[in-house]
Amino acid sequence: MFAVIKTGGKQYRVAPDDVLEIGKIDGEPGTIVQLNEVLVVGGDTPVLGVPAVAGASVAVEVLDHKRGPKVIAFKKRRRKNSRRKRGYRDELTLIRVSEILTDNAKPTKGPRPKKAKAEAPAADAAE
C-alpha cells in the first residue's frame, strides 16, 4: 500500500517504513504525528482524492529536526560593481512513515524503541 501526501507545498509518494526528509513540521523527536492531506491512497483498489481523500491520513514518527545544506543566492550586475550575496538553510524534519490510515482510523503503532548499544554484549564476552 502507498499514499501520496502533500506537506510544505510538495508532494511525496510514501509507503510504510519509508524514511524521508520534509520541510519542518511540529513535533518532538520520538512522537507520532498525523499528516491529513492525502491525495492518493494506492493498493489493490486505488482511491484518488478530489482534491484530498476523505478520512485518510498518514501516521509518521518524527525522528529528528535538522538544517539542510546552505543555499547561496548571488546576484551580480556586470560593470557596475554591484553584488549581493545571500544564503539560507532550510529547516528539515526527518520522518519515518508508521502506517497509512483510512476511514478516520487512529494510529495503532507507537514510536519504535531505540536500539540498545552494541557495547554492552561485547563487555560480557570479555569476562
From Swiss-Prot:
Matches recorded under Pfam families: Ribosomal_L21p
Keywords carried by this UniProt record: Ribonucleoprotein, Ribosomal protein, RNA-binding, rRNA-binding
Cellular compartments per GO CC: cytoplasm; ribonucleoprotein complex; ribosome
GO MF terms, alphabetically ordered: rRNA binding; structural constituent of ribosome
Region Disordered: start-end pairs: 102-127
Transmembrane segments: none
InterPro entries named in the record: bL21-like (IPR028909), bL21-like_sf (IPR036164), Ribosomal_bL21 (IPR001787)
Single GO biological process annotation from the record: translation
Keyword rRNA-binding in annotation: yes
Residues in coiled coil: none
Role of this protein: This protein binds to 23S rRNA in the presence of protein L20.
HAMAP family cross-referenced by the UniProt entry: Ribosomal_bL21 (MF_01363)
NCBIfam families to which the protein is assigned, alphabetical: L21 (TIGR00061)
PANTHER family (UniProt xref): 50S RIBOSOMAL PROTEIN L21, LARGE RIBOSOMAL SUBUNIT PROTEIN BL21M
Oligomer status and interactors: Part of the 50S ribosomal subunit. Contacts protein L20.
Protein family (similarity comment): Belongs to the bacterial ribosomal protein bL21 family.
Annotated protein name in UniProt: Large ribosomal subunit protein bL21
Source organism: Bradyrhizobium sp. (strain BTAi1 / ATCC BAA-1182)
Taxonomic path: Bacteria, Pseudomonadati, Pseudomonadota, Alphaproteobacteria, Hyphomicrobiales
Recorded name of the encoding gene: rplU
